[in-house]
Structure formats: C-alpha cells, structure tokens
C-alpha cells in the first residue's frame, strides 16, 4: 500500500463503486466469513457484478474469494458470475477454505507459473512466499494453478439453485435448507438429547 499508485478508501465497497466513476485493472473482493451473514449477499449478487463490470478497464479482472459453504451457495455465486461475465476461472483455496474466482469481460490469459512469478515485483514475491506452502514464487504459483476447478462443475453442484440476486440471497437462507434436510434435523435432535454430535 506504500506506493503513489495506491489510494486507500475506507468505505462500503459496493456503495463506493456505485458513487464512483473510477475504472480499475483489478477489483479484489475478500469478504470475511461467514458467507451466510446478513447482508453479505450484496457482495456476491448479479446486481453487484453488474456494478463491478462498469468499473473494470478493458482487460480488467475481478478476483473474489468465496468462503467454503454449502453446495447451494457455491452454485448460486458461480452461476451469478457466469451469467455476469463471459470469462470465469476458479481455484480451490490452498487450505480448502473456499474458492477463488477470476472473472473478466475478456479472455483471462493462461500464464505459466514461471510467467506469473516473473511479473512480481520483489516485495510482492517476498509476501507471496511468506504465506507458503511454496518456498519460491514459482512453486507457489504451481500449487495454485494445480488447484483449478471446473466452473461448470461448481454451477452444477446444485443445478436447481438460481443465480444469487439482491432480492434472492440464497446464502442467507441457509437455515431453511438445513432444517429441510432430514440428516441435519437428526443431528440437531441428537445434540438436544445429549448425544453430542457436532452440527
């Protein structure tokens, strides 16, 4: 952040974009879990992605992390992205904590680990290997690239769920899905009856 090219804005990201005319090469969204939190759908909805599209320069990329959740949430967000952007790639988190999406209005280059590592300034390379598990930037990128997922398979995890929308926040309806699942209800009853079983 210590560069004349960066400007830190403390604001609600969606509201800021809706009031701004600025264009960006990259928009990164890394919302804190839980993904089921009230209002969090506003950062995963088709309407939000329409706003993001208006603020990406030609060739710009949206990068978004989706914390691990149930299949309905994953499918709903993946569907919203696919319906909003013609080019979407997905990568499983190295720690298994969710999915990282890349989305763009133009094809996303498929660079090798060596090419990606070669684009990093030295401070960014040091930051990248600090997080591990790779010991070099190239090794880190090899690991990331080996975790690519099929976006179509993410959408198909729950093929009946619609794209997440502002007025249909699939992620926030988690309790209804869980309570309609007989196996989940059985776990609840076991826990209530003192037969400890985690939910």
What residue ranges belong to the model's regions?
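The AdoMet/dcAdoMet-binding core of the Class I SAM-like
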Residues: 1-78, 82-84, 90
